[in-house]
Regions:
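Flexible, acidic glycine-rich loops studded with aromatic residues
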Residues: 259-274, 280-421
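Short, compositionally stereotyped local motifs that mark structural "simplifiers"
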Residues: 379-502, 508-544, 553, 559, ...
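Feature activates predominantly on carbohydrate-active enzymes
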Residues: 1-189, 194-206, 247, 251, ...
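Active-site beta-loop-alpha junctions enriched in small/polar residues
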Residues: 33, 62-66, 149-153, 212-214, ...
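Active-site neighborhood of glycoside hydrolase catalytic domains
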Residues: 157-163, 167-273, 280-292
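Short beta-strand-plus-loop segments that form exposed binding edges in beta-rich domains
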Residues: 599-604
Length: 604
């Protein structure tokens, strides 16, 4: 009901509303380790969840970058483990604050303290804090699910209690941090003692134990881990992790709790009392495997539901189109074990609540739609944005830093021959669009877009939308390129159909560096695609010729996770490079009929 004007009383006709959610679990996960959120900030997240009928708050309370929950038996976890010197994530945030003229990336001063001359960042929740937040959530119909991640992602604890790790093997492995040592009985006792205190603070029957991204190399070297493998008649370090997870589940059940784990634990032999959080979009078998084992599954594949990922024009559309039960391999009985959906917010590059708001609104509202409505009842994108208008008005009143819907009417690179017109639209009424053409950041004093702009030369635009309250959204940059049709080339004598694809064993973060990595295979592909044989560390270089049927301006979409580049006629046309989540850019070029050399690079 949208209230307008200053009238104080309203009449609502007598009606009967019949409505119910499609899924029982409608969740949101907040990472409090990489960056810390105080009590009021957590309550604010709970308020937003409550507005849109999300009812499960998954609280990530420990990780390598900080331990956030008081454990009375082990005081160093918060005395020392809750605080750190600025790390690469903090430095990246501070750099972005300056580069993008965006205070959302500044590190809050109330989470910084000076100890013996060192600047430390952090914070933690006392038992009383936890009880207060749990009560606040309960009043809003929200269950709180704590996560203490183990056996990996445990460096904040291991740094204070090094005896928890394999002897002499503390730090970082090839990808992830050193895990705990499951060969030590004392380590297992430590884990149980931590969870005993956690169980007492959180009344909900489920507790999350993590279980993801475990660096097992230390276990291969550790005599105690190898002894455990022999004693328990295990065959590998993978089975050692499975043994540890099963052992913890027994402890959970003995204490009246049920275990939830990330989808890496789906093959660990857990009981049907356990639940699985499916996060790896590429682990396609996790969902059918878990449901076949009669384990409840919380669906949150990163491609759709990692709200820390950068947003583009497709983000909301993808969420609305997603059906958690669409996997054709699932029987009707298996679909009954799909417990619901959840969005996850990892906070490496999110230091402020304003940045959280920007990343989750309106995506949280789209999540609520698919959690509540049957597929046939969901709105299409146009209708969804129409329904959002009053929601944005509510956000304005609440002073929520929501993301303004994408400006429409242009691509990342736009081609024209003689002259063209820039015509913009914004789906949200009441906004202002300011722009610059000199590379600077648009401000409230920059030129106001109030109608079509005539362009007769190559021009770089920076557009920024300002909400009705005057607060800015992110800057969008686009290039208009004036150029004649690019000439075609003469066909080589030995030209064959398809593209040549060279696969490199690449572990870097820039497409230009792929060539230096070892070659693992060469293929011919019919289109720009990843050959079926290519897995693991991927660096692909695809080369060939594009056959253009007629003179014209052609449009290319480049979608990748991580980086990609498109080079046409020797010119870098599409730059989607760097390590990032799924992002699409669209570019144009004026081409003459005939053959044009093309190169596409991609790494993951």
């Amino acid at each position: 009901i949208e209230v307008q004007g200053e009238k104080q009383t309203y009449s609502i006709p007598v009606v009967q509303i019949e409505d119910a959610p499609r899924f029982e679990w409608r969740g949101f996960m907040l990472d409090a380790s990489r960056h810390f959120w105080n009590k009021d900030e957590v309550k604010h997240v709970l308020d937003l969840m409550s507005l849109y009928k999300l009812n499960k708050f998954h609280w990530h309370l420990s990780d390598d970058q900080g331990w956030r929950i008081e454990i009375e038996k082990y005081p160093l976890l918060t005395e020392k483990g809750a605080w750190r010197k600025f790390n690469k994530h903090d430095r990246t945030c501070m750099a972005r604050a300056k580069e993008e003229d965006n205070t959302d990336f500044l590190i809050p001063e109330d989470k910084i303290r000076i100890v013996e001359g060192d600047t430390l960042y952090g914070g933690y929740y006392t038992h009383d804090d936890i009880k207060e937040i749990v009560a606040y959530a309960t009043q809003r119909g929200i269950d709180v699910i704590p996560e203490i991640d183990m056996p990996g992602h445990f460096l904040a604890a291991i740094s204070q209690y090094p005896e928890l790790a394999c002897d002499g093997l503390i730090g970082w492995g090839e990808i992830f941090s050193s895990p705990i040592c499951p060969g030590k009985d004392a380590t297992l006792e430590f884990c149980r003692n931590v969870f005993k205190e956690v169980f007492e603070l959180f009344p909900y029957e489920y507790v999350h134990m993590g279980g993801d991204e475990v660096e097992k190399a230390n276990w291969r070297k550790c005599p105690l881990c190898q002894k455990r493998i022999r004693t328990e008649k295990l065959g590998s370090v993978e089975e050692l992790q499975a043994w540890f997870v099963r052992d913890m589940e027994k402890f959970f059940l003995a204490n009246g709790k049920r275990l939830i784990g990330w989808d890496e634990v789906v093959a660990d032999g857990l009981s049907s009392d356990a639940a699985i959080t499916w996060w790896r979009s590429w682990a396609k078998d996790a969902l059918p495997t878990a449901t076949a084992q009669k384990q409840k599954v919380i669906v949150c594949p990163n491609e759709y539901f990692y709200f820390d990922y950068a947003q583009d024009q497709n983000s909301v559309k993808k969420i609305l189109a997603y059906d958690p039960c669409a996997d054709e391999r699932l029987s009707p009985e298996q679909k009954e074990y799909i417990w619901g959906v959840q969005a996850n917010l990892w906070a490496e590059w999110i230091p402020t609540m304003k940045r959280i708001e920007y990343l989750i609104v309106p995506r949280m509202i789209a999540l609520s739609e698919i959690a509540w409505a049957e597929p046939t009842a969901k709105p299409d994108l146009e209708e969804f944005y129409r329904q959002l208008v009053p929601q944005f008005k509510r956000m304005d009143v609440m002073r929520v830093n929501y993301r303004v819907p994408d400006l429409q009417g242009f691509y990342k690179v736009n081609a024209f021959i003689d002259e063209t017109t820039v015509e913009l639209t914004c789906p949200l009424p009441g906004t202002e669009i300011r722009y610059t053409t000199d590379g600077s950041m648009p401000t409230k004093e920059s030129a106001l877009y109030n109608g079509a702009l005539e362009v007769g030369k190559t021009t770089d635009f920076a557009f920024r939308t300002f909400r009705p309250d005057g607060s800015p959204s992110d800057v969008v940059r686009t290039k208009y390129v004036k150029a004649p049709y690019a000439e075609a080339v003469t066909a080589p004598a030995a030209l064959q159909p398809g593209l040549k694809a060279v696969w490199h064993d690449f572990r870097g973060n820039l497409c230009a560096d792929i060539d230096a990595a070892p070659v693992k295979g060469e293929y011919v592909v019919e289109s720009v695609s990843i050959p079926e044989e290519v897995k693991g560390n991927i660096g692909l270089v695809m080369t060939g010729y594009l056959e253009v049927p007629a003179d014209g301006i052609y449009t290319f979409a480049l979608l990748s996770d991580d980086g990609s580049t498109l080079t046409l006629d020797g010119e870098l046309l599409g730059d989607n490079d760097g390590a990032h989540s799924s992002v699409e850019i669209i570019v144009q070029k004026a081409l003459k009929a005939g053959l044009h050399p093309i190169e596409v690079r991609y790494f993951d």
